[in-house]
């Protein structure tokens, strides 16, 4: 791979299906079919990324299965079970202004309007109504917090996201 950025994981190869090398696909994309908008895929085998192309895919009941070029037997498919499916970071679709990929928010420092450093985004939780930042508090948090949950609601709680500085400005009480 030519990129210095870590590939973006979009899913995982599941169990083999049938005798012709098809595999079940677990997709982490918003719509499960969106994983097929990207080509080629990178799969991680024995710690190394390698390129593969999808020859064809289809629904099998509620599951999605795919045939990969060069994988023509059940034994070959079984060797790929549980491999991650990724794409180069630069292949990600551009987002409109004020929309962000979760992976870009992870690790950002969260600071409130009074300049208090609340910690770093550890993960993001999807709740249905809005996403929530799980912020791991700094070791010497002045309010005794170990983590904070801040709704990702722009203009109300999230005032500014500066990816270049890896910083998120929030209107949030550090004691909450």
From Swiss-Prot:
> In what residue span(s) does the PRC barrel domain sit?
97-176
Q: Which gene carries the instructions for this protein?
A: rimM
Entry domain remark: The PRC barrel domain binds ribosomal protein uS19.
Among Gene3D superfamilies, the record links this protein to: PRC-barrel domain, RimM
Is the keyword ATP-binding in the record?
Answer: no
| Gene Ontology cellular component terms for the protein in this record | cytoplasm; ribosome
One GO MF annotation is: ribosome binding
A Pfam family this chain is assigned to = RimM
Q: What is this protein called?
A: Ribosome maturation factor RimM
Where in the cell does this protein reside?
Cytoplasm
Asked if the record carries the keyword Chaperone, the reply is yes
Q: Which keywords annotate this record?
A: Chaperone, Cytoplasm, Ribosome biogenesis, rRNA processing
| Xref: InterPro entries | PRC_barrel-like_sf, PRC_RimM, RimM, RimM_N, RimM_N_sf, Transl_B-barrel_sf
GO BP terms in the entry: ribosomal small subunit biogenesis; rRNA processing
Q: How does this chain assemble? A: Binds ribosomal protein uS19.
Function recorded in the entry:
An accessory protein needed during the final step in the assembly of 30S ribosomal subunit, possibly for assembly of the head region. Essential for efficient processing of 16S rRNA. May be needed both before and after RbfA during the maturation of 16S rRNA. It has affinity for free ribosomal 30S subunits but not for 70S ribosomes.
- Family that this chain belongs to: Belongs to the RimM family.
């Amino acid at each position: 791979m030519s990129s210095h950025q870590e590939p973006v994981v979009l899913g995982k190869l599941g169990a083999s299906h049938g005798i012709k090398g098809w595999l079940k696909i677990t997709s982490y994309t918003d719509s499960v079919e969106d994983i097929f908008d990207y080509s080629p895929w990178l799969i991680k085998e024995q710690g190394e990324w390698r390129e593969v192309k999808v020859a064809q895919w289809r629904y099998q009941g509620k599951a999605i299965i795919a045939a990969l070029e060069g994988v023509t037997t059940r034994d070959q498919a079984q060797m790929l079970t549980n491999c991650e499916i990724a794409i180069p970071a630069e292949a990600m679709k551009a987002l409109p202004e004020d929309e962000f990929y979760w992976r870009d928010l992870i690790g950002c420092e969260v600071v409130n309007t009074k300049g208090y450093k609340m910690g770093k985004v550890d993960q993001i939780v999807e709740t249905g109504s809005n996403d929530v930042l799980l912020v791991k508090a700094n070791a010497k948090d002045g309010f005794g917090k170990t983590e904070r949950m801040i709704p990702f609601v722009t203009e109300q709680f999230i005032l500014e996201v500066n990816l270049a500085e890896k910083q998120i400005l929030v209107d949030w009480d550090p004691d909450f």
